Regions:
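Histidine-acidic metal/acid-base catalytic patches
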Residues: 28, 32-35, 39-40, 66-70, ...
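Alpha-helix N-cap/loop-to-helix boundary motif
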Residues: 94-101, 124-132
Length: 228
C-alpha cells in the first residue's frame, strides 16, 4: 500500500506496463521470501499471500487478470494467493483505496481458480454502511470464492483513529463507540462467512498506543467472542 501511495501507477491492475511490472516485481520478491522461509523450516510457513487490485482510480480488470495469471505460475512455498477486496473506486466519494469492484474481482477469481478475502472495514468504507460487508460476504460465498474474513472496523465519525470513513482498522463498537462494527454485525457476518465456505476468520484492529497488554487482549477477545 505504501508503494500505491508513492506511485499512482503502481499496481497489479495497472494498464500501464511499467506500473504493473513494478508490482509484479514486488510480488516475485514476496514469493521468494515465502519459499525461502518454508525451505528453512522444512514446511509451508505461509498459508496465504494477499494481493490487491491497485492502482487507485485506474484499476483495469484485464491487467489484473494478466497479473494474476503470471503470479499463479510462481512458486509460493506452499502458500496460495488470495485477493483482498478493498473499497472500489466511486466517482462521487473520496477513495481510501479505490480499486476494482468486488464483482470484477469475483469474475476474475472464478476464472482463475482463486479466492477472495473480505476485510469488514474496507467493505464498510466502500458502501458507507455496516450492511456492505455482510452483502460482500454473501456475494463472495455464493460465487464460491470466499477465502475468509478479517474484522477491522470503520465509522462515519471522526475519532481517535482518524477522520470519518478512514480505513483505520477501528476496534469493535464496545471498544470504540464510533465504530459500526458491532458485536451483532460480527456475529451475523461470521455465520454468513462460515456458511459461505470461509476457511478462516481473523481480526485486524488498531488500539490506543499506550494500551497495556491486558487491554489489547480484551479488545481482540471482544471480536473473537462475537464470532462464536
Amino acid at each position: 500500500m505504501q508503494n500505491v501511495g508513492k506511485n499512482p501507477l503502481f499496481g497489479l491492475a495497472c494498464a500501464d506496463e511499467e506500473g504493473r511490472g513494478l508490482a509484479i516485481a514486488q510480488a516475485k520478491q514476496i514469493s521468494e521470501v515465502a519459499r525461502e522461509l518454508s525451505d528453512y523450516l522444512g514446511h509451508a510457513a505461509v498459508s496465504k499471500v494477499q494481493v490487491h487490485s491497485a492502482p487507485t482510480r485506474l484499476a483495469d480488470a484485464n491487467a489484473f487478470r494478466t497479473s494474476l495469471e503470471e503470479l499463479k505460475e510462481l512458486d509460493w512455498g506452499g502458500a496460495t494467493i488470495v485477493v483482498e477486496h478493498c473499497d472500489r473506486f466511486i466517482k462521487e466519494q473520496p477513495p481510501e483505496k479505490g480499486f476494482l469492484s468486488l464483482k470484477e474481482e469475483i469474475d476474475i477469481c472464478r476464472t482463475l481458480g482463486l479466492e477472495i478475502h473480505i476485510n469488514w472495514g474496507r467493505s464498510a468504507v466502500e458502501g458507507r454502511s455496516a450492511a456492505t460487508p455482510y452483502e460482500h460476504i454473501l456475494e463472495a460465498g455464493q460465487a464460491g470464492v470466499l477465502a475468509g474474513v478479517f474484522f477491522s472496523g470503520a465509522g462515519s465519525q471522526e475519532c481517535a483513529y482518524g477522520y470519518a470513513w478512514i480505513d483505520g482498522h477501528l476496534p469493535a463498537q464496545p471498544d470504540e463507540p464510533s465504530s459500526l462494527m458491532s458485536e451483532e454485525e460480527i456475529a451475523r457476518c461470521s455465520k454468513a462467512a462460515i456458511q459461505g465456505g470461509a476457511k478462516y476468520l481473523g481480526a485486524k484492529i488498531c488500539v490506543p498506543k499506550d494500551a497495556p497488554l491486558e487491554q489489547r487482549i480484551r479488545m481482540l477477545k471482544t471480536i473473537y467472542n462475537a464470532t462464536r
